[in-house]
């Protein structure tokens, strides 16, 4: 039998640290959560509001589309508005096709952005490709900005792909078309990074990404990239989809890669429901990193799934209420109660696992199941502290949780 430690996450891959507007990506820094707006960037009010919402939800970096003159002209105004709101969030400019022109024509935009994202597959075509790529890299050097070279399988460099397909055919097709495509994605990123360095962009100013839409392709491509370079890597499954499908696909793909020690920043690309909440993707990214033990963002509320013993919905309603209140209060609690993100709360529904799970939590309650004595023992720091009874068990436990937070983490804040 293999030792238990063999199943622990592999050590983080050594990568070059990149400073993105004060947020360190790579170099052993905690994996950074980022997101992207879906507003028209020229809509300054709408974009500022969404960036603020994403940042408040926990996005440490936010990417915005810069696709035309009006968008580029809006960027410094957006940056200024955010600063006046007291929001110091790095803005990433997402450029396709005409990024070289927009950066040259709008120097205030070039200065206001914390990083440029460029796609080697559409930065330019044929004889214009290298020149337009170089123009963007030179702008990054001039303004001392990092660059993410973001390859996407949907806009892959067709010249490179054709070349590799022809070479594979000449060798008698030893690789499948899918394997050749993976190799083309990897080579596109690495060759572009090499060219950027030749132009003069420092290695600590380059982040790579290789976006695909299938789980197995993401695992393969990032494993290849990680073995061939020490560049900081941005993980993300593009076009993951809506709802549970998108969450499951992103978690399956990035969870495996992160377990291998690969990845320095992540974005969960969920398609929101019509008029849905864009911050959902930030929440999922945080939860992925937290459940895997890589970072702590918010107190954990453990709750049993329910069974025939738990015909009452009290434990479900209480768990939901506590989780909702925690998420709502976290922006204030982070400042007021340092370390509160490490809190573990248990809300269990019957006697089978309730007491044991509650003992493992910092504070937990075991609510009575069907036919059980209508009493709810509360455990604090592993010890039974008291038993709640009566119609206000839920409200009483909520008050105990708040009291526990104030006593444990409020004292820490005062000491600091």
From Swiss-Prot:
Originating species: Allorhizobium ampelinum (strain ATCC BAA-846 / DSM 112012 / S4) (Agrobacterium vitis (strain S4))
Coiled coil regions, renumbered to chain: none
Function: Converts 2C-methyl-D-erythritol 2,4-cyclodiphosphate (ME-2,4cPP) into 1-hydroxy-2-methyl-2-(E)-butenyl 4-diphosphate.
UniProt pathway annotation: Isoprenoid biosynthesis; isopentenyl diphosphate biosynthesis via DXP pathway; isopentenyl diphosphate from 1-deoxy-D-xylulose 5-phosphate: step 5/6
Catalytic function, reaction form: (2E)-4-hydroxy-3-methylbut-2-enyl diphosphate + oxidized [flavodoxin] + H2O + 2 H(+) = 2-C-methyl-D-erythritol 2,4-cyclic diphosphate + reduced [flavodoxin]
Highest taxon, organism lineage: Bacteria
Cofactor(s) needed for function: [4Fe-4S] cluster
Keywords, alphabetical: 4Fe-4S, Iron, Iron-sulfur, Isoprene biosynthesis, Metal-binding, Oxidoreductase
GO-annotated biological processes: isopentenyl diphosphate biosynthetic process, methylerythritol 4-phosphate pathway; terpenoid biosynthetic process
Pfam families registered for this protein in UniProt: GcpE
Free-text cofactor note: Binds 1 [4Fe-4S] cluster.
Gene3D superfamilies: Dihydropteroate synthase-like, Sulfite Reductase Hemoprotein, domain 1
Residues bound to [4Fe-4S] cluster: 304, 307, 350, 357
Molecular function terms, GO-annotated: 4 iron, 4 sulfur cluster binding; 4-hydroxy-3-methylbut-2-en-1-yl diphosphate synthase activity (ferredoxin); 4-hydroxy-3-methylbut-2-enyl-diphosphate synthase activity (flavodoxin); iron ion binding
Enzyme Commission number(s) from the entry: 1.17.7.3
Keyword 4Fe-4S among record annotations: yes
Transmembrane segments: none
Identification of the protein by name: 4-hydroxy-3-methylbut-2-en-1-yl diphosphate synthase (flavodoxin)
Family classification: Belongs to the IspG family.
InterPro entries: Dihydropteroate_synth-like_sf, IspG_bac, IspG_bac-typ, NO2/SO3_Rdtase_4Fe4S_sf
């Amino acid at each position: 039998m293999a030792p238990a430690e063999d199943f622990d996450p592999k050590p983080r891959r050594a990568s070059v640290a990149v400073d993105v507007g004060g947020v360190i990506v790579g170099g052993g820094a905690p994996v950074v959560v980022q997101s992207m707006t879906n507003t028209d960037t020229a809509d300054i009010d709408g974009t500022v509001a969404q960036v603020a919402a994403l940042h408040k939800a926990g996005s440490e970096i936010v990417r915005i589309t810069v696709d035309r003159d009006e968008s580029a002209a809006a960027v410094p105004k957006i940056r200024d508005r955010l600063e006046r709101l007291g929001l110091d969030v790095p803005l990433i400019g997402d450029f396709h096709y005409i990024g070289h022109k927009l950066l040259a024509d709008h120097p205030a935009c070039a200065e206001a952005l914390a990083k440029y994202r460029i796609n080697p597959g559409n930065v330019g075509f044929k004889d214009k490709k290298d020149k337009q790529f170089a123009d963007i890299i030179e702008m990054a050097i001039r303004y001392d900005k990092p660059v993410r070279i973001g390859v996407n399988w949907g806009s892959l460099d067709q010249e490179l792909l054709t070349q590799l397909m022809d070479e594979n055919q000449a060798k008698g097709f030893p690789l499948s078309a899918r394997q050749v495509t993976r190799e083309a994605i990897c080579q596109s990123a690495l060759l572009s990074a090499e060219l950027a360095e030749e132009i003069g962009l420092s290695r600590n100013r380059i982040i790579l990404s290789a976006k695909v839409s299938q789980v197995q392709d993401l695992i393969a491509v990032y494993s290849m990239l990680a073995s061939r370079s020490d560049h900081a890597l941005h993980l993300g499954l593009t076009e993951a989809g809506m709802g549970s499908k998108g969450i499951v696909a992103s978690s399956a793909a990035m969870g495996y890669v992160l377990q291998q020690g690969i990845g320095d920043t992540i974005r969960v690309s969920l398609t929101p429901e019509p008029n849905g909440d864009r911050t959902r993707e930030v929440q999922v990214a945080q939860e992925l990193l937290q459940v895997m033990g890589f970072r702590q963002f918010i107190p954990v509320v453990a709750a049993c799934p329910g069974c025939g013993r738990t015909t009452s919905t009290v434990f479900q309603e209480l768990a939901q209420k506590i989780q909702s209140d925690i998420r709502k209060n976290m922006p204030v609690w982070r400042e007021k109660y340092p370390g509160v993100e490490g809190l573990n709360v248990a809300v269990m529904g019957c006697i089978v696992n309730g007491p044991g799970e509650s003992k493992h939590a910092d504070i937990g309650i075991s609510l009575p199941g069907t036919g059980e004595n209508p009493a709810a023992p509360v455990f604090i720091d592993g010890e039974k502290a008291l038993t709640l009874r009566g119609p206000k068990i839920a409200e009483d436990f909520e008050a105990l949780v708040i009291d526990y937070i104030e006593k444990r983490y409020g004292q820490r804040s005062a000491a600091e």
